[in-house]
């Protein structure tokens, strides 16, 4: 798989990024392990997740799947999405971004 430089960083990432929106909801852990392994075998080293995906289950599952191989992957996550109706559990404030990560 072709790679590209991520912005101005020195990171080289695969041109395709594995999305994990359904991990933790419609994708059980063992299926997620197989999906990630297959992607890696094809040259993918870039995974996308977000705190809002299945209310954090996706990020948790990605962590479980990558345990012991974290150094082989580049992770992209998103913040800002509302995790609840509470005003301090959404948006782009410094405190929320640190808590979300």
Each model region followed by its residue ranges:
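N-terminal binding-site loop/beta-alpha segment at the start of enzyme catalytic domains
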Residues: 1-77, 81-83
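Glycine/proline-rich, positively charged
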Residues: 86-101
């Amino acid at each position: 798989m072709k790679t590209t430089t991520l912005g101005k960083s020195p990171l080289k990432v695969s041109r395709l990024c594995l999305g994990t929106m359904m991990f933790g909801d419609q994708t059980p852990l063992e299926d997620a392990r197989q999906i990630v392994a297959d992607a890696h075998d094809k040259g993918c080293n870039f995974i996308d997740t977000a705190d809002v995906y299945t209310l954090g289950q996706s990020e948790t599952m990605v962590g479980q799947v990558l345990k012991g191989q974290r150094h082989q992957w580049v992770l992209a996550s998103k913040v800002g999405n509302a995790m609840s109706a509470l005003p301090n559990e959404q948006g782009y404030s410094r405190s929320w971004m640190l808590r979300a990560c």
